[in-house]
Amino acid sequence: MRPKGIDLFKVAGIQIAIDYSWIVIFLLVSWSLSAGYFPHEYPGYAWGAYLTVGVVATLLFFASVVTHELAHSLVANRLGQPVRRITLFIFGGMAHLSREPSNATAEMKIAVVGPLTSLALGALFWVCKRIVAGAGLPLLWAAVFKYLAFINVALALFNLLPGFPLDGGRILRGLLWRRSGDLRAPRRVRRIGEPASPSV
């Protein structure tokens, strides 16, 4: 059955799509940033400026989520676990793996690259923040990159929690799988990570 949603574009043969629920969270995050975070932290700008940076920051945040999922997908494709679709939805993003990894090493490689990518994006956005601030451009634009730096680091740390199906849970599953040679390790990971893992 074809997943419901809107197809946007393809990257390396992988279809990027949005679920209809994503529109709701996009509007909520844009409004929260435009009417709450940026005016509170950086007062004195016009409403139009807050709206602009709020929408731009939200788009770049979700671009970061797509990049995180693309990292998973490209590594999975290279390891023979085909991914043909990534969907953004109300709780974030999801790469649609055609099947589960065939061995513990593949499991860990596919899982760990996501948080590493988010950390790299956090560092990149922090450098952008320093460049914008040093160039004498409006502080509000430096604030956008500062927000994106922190949110990407937070995304990486959250995904490293040992709760399935977070990346940390998959890494732990791979470690248990490698150590025991037992494919039933995921059940133990779910028990270990249950308190830490909300629906994502």
Residue locations for each model-derived region?
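Hydrophobic transmembrane alpha-helices and their immediate loop junctions
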Residues: 1-200
